[in-house]
Amino acid sequence: RVLAAKECTNIYAPLANRLGIGQLKWELEDYCFRYLHPTEYKRIAKLLHERRLDREHYIEEFVGHLRAEMKAEGVKAEVYGRPKHIYSIWRKMQKKNLAFDELFDVRAVRIVAESLQDCYAALGIVHTHYRHLPDEFDDYVANPKPNGYQSIHTVVLGPGGKTVEIQIRTKQMHEDAELGVAAHWKYKEGAAAGGARSGHEDRIAWLRKLIAWQEE
């Protein structure tokens, strides 16, 4: 399993990243981390579990306030909390030499807007109601990542001075971020697929079989 995890780290996770398939990339990274660093994996998983209820209650209130403000301003967007992946938490702890409690993005929210205009309107609402940390702001909509990833990232100080990481993107950007190149296969094959299983789903299933094969 350790050998398989190393192969996933060196081959499949980078491949998923290059293809822009965020969902698969996160699954692979957590799988690899679980076997390559079992002690750290269990420690972070335990911390996340211990504080889950407090974190969920905090995010629920935070999201409720944002939804109300956006509705009042006529901004069309979905707002919800999003799970954090154990490997990404550990990597940020290592990179920035931070303790678990110091991380910005253990509390995380995503805003999926109807249009690009709604994206920036949502950003304006967020920054109007909460003080943001300028060093943690990135506009990958105006400046996409090399793999095509687009989102606005910002970190704000929520109630009680607790940091909250927020991603803002359109529905199209969200699908691209989750499925990568497979999203484009979906667009091309959607009309022909009808009610049947689409080609992009087959391709995603094939990529996931790589993980299952490595686990055997």
Regions found by a protein language model. Give the residues of each.
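Nucleic-acid processing machinery
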Residues: R1-E216
